[in-house]
Amino acid sequence: MMKKLLSLGIAVFVFTSCARGEWRLVWSDEFEGQTLNTAYWNVEDNARGGGNAELQYYAPKNVTIEKHPLSGESCLVLNAQRENYKNRPCTSARLNTHDKVTVEYGKVEARIAFPHTADGLWPAFWMLGNNLATNLGNNDDVDKRAAQLAAEGRVVWPKCGEIDICEMGHHTGIENGTQDRFFNGACHWGESFNNGAYPNFGQFKTADYPVQGDFHLYTLIWSEDSIAMYLDQDRYPEAEPYFQLSLRGKEVNEPGHYFNHPFYLVLNLSVGGFFPQMPAAEKYPEVITEDDSSFQKVTALPADGTPVKMYVDYIRVYKKRG
């Protein structure tokens, strides 16, 4: 049964379930319709580069629902490809559930087939605090709008908090030749950006087997006291987490002060940026061409414009029983 709840004045769709065990399903998207469910998802349309000097234009046309070519399962697909589009040399996709679906504690899992990232792709499944002001443009606007943001109950990054459940494509994996097994989880927080000197914690993992090209399960378990992330819990239920962070410290600048409110979901497939060490020459450039020195290093996108695809089979959110 589906019911509509109100959380912080936000319409949030939640599914109830009679599933057995420690966890009960409270929301999911199985991506089985003909089109994306926009009651849940916002599709981004911009060239801001995520604040990370990325190279792509995020275009709504690059978000599709398709059958996986091998499994036949209906999936959300994020497509990245070479094409000159709105002053960018490539396009890709990013979408989020801001102000539509939020999570506060519980278990979040996603079954995803990440693409082969080397060299230059940066896919991620992550979360941001739902109190984030999303319409700022770039960081230059923050000081001018501080009072207005406070009145709206909004904050700027990283005060909202960020939970990166899985990222791939880091330059270390490229350098070590382990890019198909190298991934990480991370958290970011703090009162202000502070020229990059904000608190954060990340843990990198080199898996025993490839985690690109095929489906794998990525799980976040989040309580008032801790955050933990797991790979393939369905196959390896006793495996140790690849990321752990204590939230017991609740003072300002301690993580427990920032990860105690609703967060929304984000999926994206970036091209270039700081993470793979292929950034644009400027953080917010007006124009990037195919002659850009960083774009010249991107080998993961076929020269003929064939899309590279990130498949998402499902995302599910659970709460503990009792």
Task: Name each region found by the language model.
Residues 2-8:
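Sec-dependent signal peptide recognition
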Residues 9-19:
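Hydrophobic h-region of N-terminal signal peptides that target proteins for export
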